[in-house]
Amino acid sequence: MSESIICVADDVGARVWLERVLESEWNLECLSSTDLSRVSRLVQATGAPVVLVAIDENDANRALKVFAAIQKACPNSQLIGVAHRLSQDLLLSIMRAGARDCLVTGVDADTARDRVRRIADSAAQAPTAAPSAGRGDITLVVSASSIVDTRFFCQNFVAELNEYQAGKSILAMDSNSEANRTFYFDNLSRLTLDELISRGDSIDRSLVETALEEYQDGLRLLSGDISSELLKGDAAADLYITISQLATLFDHMVIRVDPAHTGEWLRAIGANVNRIIVVTHPVVDQVQATETLLQEIKEWVAPECSRYIAVDGYHRRASLSLSDIEKTLDQKCDLVLPMEWRFRLDAMNAGLPMANMLHKSTYHRNMGGFIRTCCATGETRRKFTFKRAAV
């Protein structure tokens, strides 16, 4: 998968047909035509080269309105109609509305993918700005098991990342958190991710600076409790739009994803993720589950997306060695973190990253080395300061 294609369809049959004939060549973002504002904002957010619009022959005017809205929002997107039946008059109407082609579900199954590819290729050759222009990096932190404490990992990852990326703005997002908490940090932000998604309007820098607390210089926190319902259908499109808008306001976004929703997050925003960190314990069943998760990740992210393995709680005298883990995953373990349970407890209870505790730990040193290698090459080290004391 190299890019996203948007499908605007109220008819489930048309969506299923497109998923089948297009196979997995594109990431198909589906939503209904009931909210033209949502359709337009998603087209703008994705910069999708092709938009497929299902046409109901009994209500063709709705499809024509969708064509008009998309052309206004993103004139460079190429439009393709999809219909179960197609009269000559209807074909002329949608072509006048700007469609480059129209696929008929009962006839064009064998040729649909090639026709869409030709139009997508022609759109890619047009002299337009890249869809990701002006968009910051997006890093997902995931795990195959809920036993893994990705909250603690993210707490230290974002603090260390912020320390090494001087002059950059970072948004740390916990997609499944308690009220007023982001990871183990106290969060005094006025808005949650759920509320940003439900706003239905644009997110600008003024809103971010007012509503999201700056925990450290350059680091802001955002909490959420994203349920399965917000990761499906039109709600998933709203999530994509919100994440895309936030990504234009920050140099780097780090999102902790709950293991129960990893697949849904990958389907929703995987095409625009720059980096995925998979955290696992050195336990056989978790390593095997991580192997399966890595295969799923490949289906939803772009080839240039960097993928890293972090082994948390490793002990070199344990029977499961790093080489065994790497052999199973067919991938190098990029970060190895010791348990150091007492130090972890102190950091969790204090609501502070390891870097700001009195004791210096191997965990902190290894995390810093990982950041320097993978995320902060050439960056100037930031002087570490706190905006407020932990409660």
Question: For the regions a protein language model found, what residue spans apply to each?
Answer:
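Conserved phosphotransfer microenvironments
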Residues: R38-V39, P49-I70
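C-terminal output helix
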Residues: V107-V116
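Walker A/P-loop phosphate-binding motif and the immediately C-terminal alpha-helix
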Residues: R135-S177, R181-F185
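Phosphate-binding loop that captures ATP/GTP phosphates
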Residues: Y164-L221
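Cytosolic-facing regulatory segments adjacent to core modules
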Residues: G200-R267
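Conserved catalytic-core segment of NTP-binding enzymes
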Residues: I241, A247-H252, V257-L335
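Beta-strand-loop-alpha "switch" segments that mediate conformational coupling across diverse proteins
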Residues: G313-Y314, L322-A355, M367
